[in-house]
Amino acid sequence: MLDPSSSEEESDEGLEEESRDVLVAAGSSQRAPPAPTREGRRDAPGRAGGGGAARSVSPSPSVLSEGRDEPQRQLDDEQERRIRLQLYVFVVRCIAYPFNAKQPTDMARRQQKLNKQQLQLLKERFQAFLNGETQIVADEAFCNAVRSYYEVFLKSDRVARMVQSGGCSANDFREVFKKNIEKRVRSLPEIDGLSKETVLSSWIAKYDAIYRGEEDLCKQPNRMALSAVSELILSKEQLYEMFQQILGIKKLEHQLLYNACQLDNADEQAAQIRRELDGRLQLADKMAKERKFPKFIAKDMENMYIEELRSSVNLLMANLESLPVSKGGPEFKLQKLKRSQNSAFLDIGDENEIQLSKSDVVLSFTLEIVIMEVQGLKSVAPNRIVYCTMEVEGEKLQTDQAEASRPQWGTQGDFTTTHPRPVVKVKLFTESTGVLALEDKELGRVILYPTSNSSKSAELHRMVVPKNSQDSDLKIKLAVRMDKPAHMKHSGYLYALGQKVWKRWKKRYFVLVQVSQYTFAMCSYREKKSEPQELMQLEGYTVDYTDPHPGLQGGCMFFNAVKEGDTVIFASDDEQDRILWVQAMYRATGQSYKPVPAIQTQKLNPKGGTLHADAQLSGKDADRFQKHGMDEFISANPCKLDHAFLFRILQRQTLDHRLNDSYSCLGWFSPGQVFVLDEYCARYGVRGCHRHLCYLAELMEHSENGAVIDPTLLHYSFAFCASHVHGNRPDGIGTVSVEEKERFEEIKERLSSLLENQISHFRYCFPFGRPEGALKATLSLLERVLMKDIATPIPAEEVKKVVRKCLEKAALINYTRLTEYAKIEETMNQASPARKLEEILHLAELCIEVLQQNEEHHAEGREAFAWWPDLLAEHAEKFWALFTVDMDTALEAQPQDSWDSFPLFQLLNNFLRNDTLLCNGKFHKHLQEIFVPLVVRYVDLMESSIAQSIHRGFEQETWQPVKNIANSLPNVALPKVPSLPLNLPQIPNISTASWMPSLYESTNGSATSEDLFWKLDALQMFVFDLHWPEQEFAHHLEQRLKLMASDMLEACVKRTRTAFELKLQKASKTTDLRIPASVCTMFNVLVDAKKQSTKLCALDGGQEQQYHSKIDDLIDNSVKEIISLLVSKFVSVLEGVLSKLSRYDEGTFFSSILSFTVKAAAKYVDVPKPGMDLADTYIMFVRQNQDILREKVNEEMYIEKLFDQWYSSSMKVICVWLTDRLDLQLHIYQLKTLIKIVKKTYRDFRLQGVLEGTLNSKTYDTVHRRLTVEEATASVSEGGGLQGITMKDSDEEEEG
């Protein structure tokens, strides 16, 4: 029991009592009172907003008009207060004694909702993690995932709106993160020994650590608030407290109503239910008799309606009958009667009603007898042993023994009896000391006749002593406690006189026995009898106070029980006893009339109102109860009130409270709320269709105002109403009223609009796929709403048509909000072309992000409809169609031959080509149509630019190796061609890193050739990176670029070969010849051209392959030609050397002169050896040119070919020269020179990698044999010999 605080009591002292009308009469034509509004204040909840008289709407209301409105406002507030109090009375009765519903235990637990402050705290925690301000260790991949989650999700305005609407929990945030990282982790490469599931678990654990922060989770409040336990099974006290908050009831008001309604008295609550059910049956009979029915959609439903009313009451009666007689009391041991559901209230006056037998009302009592002490014992010596015995119905118990000087025990004896009026005998004995004594001596006795109403405290009783006993004042102190069985509702002595029973006016002991929830009997008992002497069933009787009967002697306060054909008069000795008897019999009879004694009426209600007279209500409580005007709410007949209207208010207030608690409920009631609403509907006959129609209306209103409502909940209620209206009888109700039909059609239309609006705003109603499964459920519900009846399915095309229309709107909504966010309209009107292009590129990125989120978070629609992805693709096309307008505007503003828009194409095309439904769709084709001319123009200009750069470049080419300018080349812009009236196009997105490696792969190419190769490669890579989606045009582009490259390479090769020939022609023919770097550069250009042709010109199949072969052949032939030219140049030098040696041929004039001169001079001076300078010079020429070629020509294969041909050609020339002199003996100087040249040449070319087969050719063998023969001849003929020069052991000869 809650005691009111003094402040509350004082604050309520000033409430004035006012006359009140009946709240809402059932079937009344009067307008229903205004319902409490949602904006009701806590101190004055439920204040009407427009329900009463309208306020003045003048722009400047006067004080007088405000004065007139104030009484109206007070009147509205008072009317709402009365409605809430009346509702609370009905609610607390449902809570106090439920007999239909239970708190469900299988409901899904709702999660705690997040608020704005928590969202801001989360942002700060994740920002701190990204800034490295936490102790959480994470790798780069996890940090990137968190950064994406923070930027895309946590900072989203849609998430902020979802939090503000109260439909978001911590679990939603966690699930979104989990969904994001699953996609990331699946795309990571496999790591040995580390599964992706382990990575996911680790990332989730780190997320939880960031989410929690450093707060101490162990700090919990000692007492959980009511809102925190609302998801649990609540006690009655918690339910009372909850609905006090819901209906705005003060503690004092609750206390007064609690006492007045006797909520802790199960008998009173059961009796109240019986009265209510009786009233509902009488109302049904009255309705059937007067033919006043609600309007139904069919006339034959009127009789069915009456049967439904009776059937529902019978069901409630059966539920009540199934309860134990006294909930929570001792086990009920009376015989369970088998009675029909149409019990007493349905069969009043029925001659065949089941009669109780006397054995049906046998009671069982527990007696506790506690013997304390005996006083006045003088007849026995102090040291004698005394004891007491207790006897009930022949069963005896004995106390412990005590000395006569202190006869005290405190012993309790427990007995069980079926006698309402048992006889208890207590005797005092002393032990006999005589030898022949057979039994102890009795000192005194007392006989008691206890009842359940007897005093239970210890009292002194005078004992009857034997004759001649000295103990004239012997007393015993004992307590007799006789319990009151749960099914014995009242007992006591009454005078009675009846026509069928108790036909003589006399005083009897009566017991009011409850046999079952609907069966009560008034029984009179004699002493030591377990069965009543007479009994009367109270079914059909009406009890009331009466005036005294003059002819009856005995009894002071009269009352009677009247039934058709029978009257029983009762009388008690005092008023209090009469009130208790009448109250107990009033509960038992189930009568609707509330008997009130005339004296008490005048005392407690001098104004003449009907007061609930309750003996348990103290005078102070009664005064307060009367003063606060609670009487009308307690005494109001529930059968005469419009419970449909009241329940609508109750459900509305409950839903408002639920949506404002700490849980993300999405419109679902808590178990305690469901229990109370279920019990209310069952007990007060609220039709299921009405309940769900009101629920739908409330849920839709909240949803329209921004709250997050679970569409599954809407689906349940709508399906129930649809089944009811279409005759499927979900709750056994077959009647359908016109009002229900009309309201259902209105709600159906409203619900359809709401669902279509939600689908049109799916990104904002279901942000990031939250609540989980909501979009799928919304689509399923829309299909259900579009059905004409509950059994006929709607064609899929009709649903598809509606959803398609919604998604068309969604495209406009999403794009409009996106452009507003990007402020694209301002940019398009004022910005420069470059700025417009930059903004449209940013907008394209946002559009792609939106569509990717749609696919990621809203693809669940395919679970409802297989065609959802197709419609989502159509939605995307509409979305892109809107983007097309802004894109075309930005592109049209670009200057002619501007290539800055290509990144836009690449961005959009890369997204579209990877989407199977959007690839080559309407927008994709439009994008291609816009960029085809641009690409063609770009390629044309690049072709012209490259051709001119080749022409100009080779004209001015210095053939300086490119490695000398490689460091500055990446920063040099492409050259401008004066003949073109425009700047040459620059390759988009070309960075140094993408082409610098090619410069260092070939370090000796020319600037023109390297520039050509880079441009061709960059152009082809650029076109390849476009990933043109249309195959035919893509193939055309590739073919054109390959053929262009072939043409350019052909021109390059021809110009290089021509330049090579000219350069070589100008070179020296003597041993002073050293291959210029420019010649090596030209050689390298051809080598590079060979390499580049494979990449730049290769196409598979057909003409292109043949064209590529042609380029390869041209390059190969050119390389062969320049090798031949080089070899010819080298051989010509050797021929010059041999020409000089020819002067020493035998028989020539010069040879004779030279030989004579040398011999003569040799006698006097050291003459240099002729021919050695010439040999050394030639050998140096060979070696240095070999080194130059080896160092500066890149391709080893061509160097080997060159050296092979050079060596073979050299040996051939020497062999021919020697062959021409077969008939001549070589001059000694000729021999020395040739031996040295041949030996050194052989050795040097072997060191350069010329193979043995080439080195030891037949030509070489011929030369070797000839020189060996000549050497032998010379050694014989010449006295001085060859001075160590010999063909033998040439490998061991030192360097000369």
Swiss-Prot record:
Residue numbers bearing the Phosphoserine modification: S56, S58, S1290
Bias type Acidic residues, positions: 1-19
Membrane-topology descriptor: Peripheral membrane protein
Domain DM10 residues, every copy: 293-400
Alphabetically ordered keywords of this record: Calcium, Cell projection, Cytoplasm, Cytoplasmic vesicle, Cytoskeleton, Exocytosis, Lipid-binding, Membrane, Metal-binding, Phosphoprotein, Protein transport, Synapse, Transport
GO molecular function annotation: lipid binding; metal ion binding
PH domain location: 487-590
Biased composition (Basic and acidic residues): 66-78
Keyword Repeat applies: no
Keyword Disulfide bond tagged: no
Domain MHD1 residue range list: 885-1056
Region (Disordered): 1-78, 1274-1296
Region (Interaction with DRD2): 755-1074
Subcellular location: Cytoplasmic vesicle membrane; Synapse; Cell projection, Cilium; Cytoplasm, Cytoskeleton, Cilium basal body
GO cellular component: centrosome; ciliary basal body; cilium; cytoplasmic vesicle membrane; glutamatergic synapse; intracellular membrane-bounded organelle; nucleoplasm; parallel fiber to Purkinje cell synapse
One Gene Ontology biological process: dense core granule exocytosis
Tissue: Widely expressed. Expressed in all adult and fetal tissues examined, with the strongest expression in kidney and pancreas. In brain, it is expressed at high levels in cerebellum, to a lesser degree in cerebral cortex, occipital pole, and frontal and temporal lobes. Only weakly expressed in medulla, spinal cord and putamen.
Record Gene3D superfamilies: Pleckstrin-homology domain (PH domain)/Phosphotyrosine-binding domain (PTB) (2.30.29.30)
Entry text on domains: The PH domain is essential for regulated exocytosis and binds phospholipids.
Subunit text: Homodimer. Interacts with the dopamine receptor DRD2.
Annotated protein name in UniProt: Calcium-dependent secretion activator 2
Organism annotation: Homo sapiens (Human)
Gene behind this protein: CADPS2
